[in-house]
């Protein structure tokens, strides 16, 4: 009997140990199981909207007061009626005007939606589990028309989810309403657990990593009504280029290693990186960011991610233009910089240091490569005064070496 007990116990504890090994392997590959979402699925973490009768009423004419204001993805686009929380409309292509809300609802992301008969939501019919189709993951894919909806009436606002690689580097312990600036810098996602940003942004945080965090998938900083939530991560290491000069901002590049990988979603993806020494010549590059003073601001329309289209400026012209400024005739543009802009009223001058400058891939214009990192400039949006950016192509080999030294794959910013 004792022998049988020992054998049984051996199998029980052996199975438990084996399961632990398997669980550890799963976590190693996918991250925490609670964070892993297979492609084709999503987790909605929004708070319940409450009873329908408590929602603001809307409607015009005969429907006046018979409809309710509800977030856009809770309204069926075909029947124009409210759906249960378990059913989320992800196929709508609404057009929202962020300047004038003509649908009577307080938020531009709310719609005036009809109530089901009797005011009671139908119980969703059970459906068999859907086996997700694994879609290939590509870097540099821009959602030009946005996700779910397209906005009108904008002034340089990006569409929702337009640039999935955009990341905000934030102070971790800002008290809401304190007036303290929350945004430290911008950045770009180059791998699930790696953010590329400017060294000048994070140099002072190397010994105080708990003071900052990153946020990916953000768009409008004053609402969480978007269908896809943003994701935040802590930073476990800051890697600054060893030759970074804080006084001249030469070699202004840094990598932020996250405490765990971000989960890929339609609003979160990576940007492609250029080959070493690659040169860009394009009028269709973009820079994006919120602006340090505008992030989370209550000033109207300043809370949505901005974009600005900029032309590249070749090195000789950029240096000549900058010599006409207070820099003087002896100024020499370091090879670690590239230039863009120089058009009246178009510049990255709102405190968006570390944010990406990206251009169409010359071999595949439907994808984007990161040309630069917002570094410095003279004035703001003046004619013939280009903005200056860290030259990402100059640092490609350095980025690869740092990634490989940490055992991280370079594939997410190549394919």
From Swiss-Prot:
Site (Cleavage): 99-100
Keywords from the named record: Antibiotic, Antimicrobial, Calcium, Disulfide bond, Glycoprotein, Immunity, Innate immunity, Metal-binding, Secreted, Serine protease homolog, Signal
Pfam families: CLIP_1, Trypsin
GO biological process: defense response to bacterium; innate immune response; proteolysis
Residues that, per the record, bind Ca(2+): 218, 220, 223, 226
Gene Ontology MF terms: metal ion binding; serine-type endopeptidase activity
Clip domain: residues covered: 57-113
Summary of the tissues where the protein is detected: Hemocytes.
Domain Peptidase S1: 151-404
SUPFAM superfamilies found in the cross-reference section: Trypsin-like serine proteases (SSF50494)
Positions in coiled-coil regions: none
The organism's place on the tree of life at top rank: Eukaryota
Recorded GO CC terms: extracellular region
Note: Stabilized by calcium.
Subunit structure comment from the entry: Heterodimer of a light chain and a heavy chain; disulfide-linked. Can oligomerize into a dodecamer. Interacts (via CLIP domain) with cleaved PPO1 and/or PPO2; the interaction results in PPO1 and/or PPO2 activation.
Family of this protein: Belongs to the peptidase S1 family. CLIP subfamily.
Protein name: Phenoloxidase-activating factor 2
